[in-house]
Amino acid sequence: MSDPALIADGYAAADIRAAEAPLLAAGAQLMRVAAAGLARACRALAPDGPVLVLVGAGNNGGDALLAAAELAREGREVGVIRTAGRIHEAGAAQAVAAGVPITSADELDDATLADIARSSALVVDGILGIGTTDSPALRGEGRRVVAALLPVVTAEGGPAVIACDIPSGVGCDDGAVPDPAVLPADVTVTFGAGKAGLMQGPGRALAGRVELVDVGLDLSGATPLVRAAR
């Protein structure tokens, strides 16, 4: 059986961002395509039950918010916990319009966070993506939330976990995990291209099954850091 993490070549974050740039400049709706793929994976992994979405700043959180809105419009019970003071405005607006409550993590103590996760069928990790420029380790409220949820998601019968693009706390290029506060994903839905960090180092074991959502990136001029088995 092939390694589920090696479904595609793994590229560096800088090459992926460079491939995204011309599409974004041309007005391509990359986030909408990514969010649809994320929502599809959520339905497949957990067809029923409440969904808890963890959202940080930036586009990774935007993908998660748009997916939350899509699931809520279909009738799923969805709640968002934001770990950053500011989150993706358009994504948040769509989530709120779909009836999704957004709660700031600093309003919830650790026991309450654990209780919310325990009552959920699925946790979506949209805290950090590939835009992290230094250490991928979670900090502040993001780290506290993940630390509070870890015993719940790793317990027998705990909720399933989907990572948005890459598990928060995993190095995109090398798979490094400098801090143990990382939610182990059952599925990682990655966008545009495989991330090398999903395919090597400690990150490989935390990624679970990797599903690639094609958003039309041209990486023909980039050299993969990790090559998939052919």
Curated annotation (Swiss-Prot):
Signal peptide: none annotated. Residues 11-223 form the YjeF N-terminal domain. Belongs to the NnrE/AIBP family. Its cofactor is K(+). GO terms for molecular function: metal ion binding; NAD(P)HX epimerase activity; nucleotide binding. Catalyzes the epimerization of the S- and R-forms of NAD(P)HX, a damaged form of NAD(P)H that is a result of enzymatic or heat-dependent hydration. This is a prerequisite for the S-specific NAD(P)H-hydrate dehydratase to allow the repair of both epimers of NAD(P)HX. It catalyses: (6R)-NADHX = (6S)-NADHX; (6R)-NADPHX = (6S)-NADPHX. It comes from the Bacteria. Keywords: Isomerase, Metal-binding, NAD, NADP, Nucleotide-binding, Potassium. (6S)-NADPHX binds at residues 59-63, 129-137, 165. K(+) binds at N60, D125, S168. This is NAD(P)H-hydrate epimerase. It comes from Clavibacter michiganensis subsp. michiganensis (strain NCPPB 382). InterPro entries: YjeF_N_dom, YjeF_N_dom_sf.
